[in-house]
Regions:
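Generic structural signal for well-ordered alpha-helices
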Residues: 19-23, 41-48, 78, 132, ...
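Glycine/proline-rich, positively charged
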Residues: 1-63
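Basic phosphate/pyrophosphate-binding loop/patch that engages nucleotide-derived ligands
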Residues: 26-27, 72-87
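Conserved short secondary-structure transition element at the edge of the structured enzyme core
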Residues: 26, 115, 121-181
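Short, hinge-like loop/turn segments at secondary-structure boundaries
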Residues: 51-55, 78-80, 105-109, 180-182
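Glycine-rich, positively charged active-site loop/lid region within alpha/beta enzyme cores that binds
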Residues: 1-4, 80-138, 204
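Conserved, mostly hydrophobic/aromatic
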Residues: 34, 62, 81, 88-91, ...
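Glycine-rich beta-alpha junction loops
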Residues: 40, 66-70, 92-99, 153, ...
Length: 204
């Protein structure tokens, strides 16, 4: 069982103090391992430094956003995840469903996440829609469902441990699961990189 505890109000606890508290929890048998979330390269390396020098528990994963519209994890953290064996648990791999293309041209599907939670405006700003349309077109040109291409891309990254999918219907779940069987061609990956070069991380 994997549980992540989120406390947006607590951001000032020193890293060493956090690790010492986690050591006590681990020694009591309440947890086996722990992971980080929304951490920076510097913060991740400080956790690993204290774990090594103070003989404290070591982070085994990092849960950060990663998708075709937000690949900022690749800037520093991807190398750490790979070389230090702190694998990425990628959340929001579909960018709140935006990479399905269902919000293009101002569409607001009933009960869809960005329809219900209008405060998440990052997927409607700047070059976001241009990037989404480009990825949707690329997928369709290659006979793929845009959702499945987006998920398959995330799953193909060497620094990934788990792709955290989300679904509100059985149809969505089935579509998502099919992506685990896809292997993207070199030509398709080159197409993705071309779009990324034009619209680099429009939704960080």
């Amino acid at each position: 069982q994997l549980n992540y505890v989120h406390d947006s109000k607590e951001v000032s606890t020193p890293i060493l103090e956090t690790l010492e508290a986690l050591a006590g929890i681990q020694n009591s048998g309440k947890i086996r391992h722990f992971g980080l979330s929304n951490e920076t390269p510097w913060g991740t390396m400080r956790f690993l430094h204290y774990s090594e020098t103070q003989q404290l528990p070591r982070a085994v994963s990092i849960q950060n956003p990663y998708n075709l519209l937000n690949r900022t994890f690749e800037i520093g953290l991807a190398e750490i995840a790979h070389r230090e064996q702190v694998g990425l648990l990628a959340y929001s791999p579909l960018a709140f469903g935006a990479l399905s293309g269902k919000y293009l041209q101002g569409n607001q599907p009933e009960n869809a996440r960005l329809t219900l939670y209008s405060r998440f405006v990052r997927y409607k700003k700047g070059h976001a829609e241009n990037a989404i349309q480009s990825y949707v077109d690329l997928a369709q040109e290659n006979g793929l469902d845009p959702t499945q291409m987006a998920l398959a891309y995330v799953s193909s990254r060497h620094f990934l441990t788990s792709n955290i999918i989300g679904a509100t219907s059985m149809e969505q779940l089935k579509t998502n699961l099919i992506s685990s069987e896809l292997e993207l061609s070199e030509e398709l990956l080159e197409g993705i990189e071309k779009i990324h070069g034009l619209y680099t991380n429009p939704c960080p």
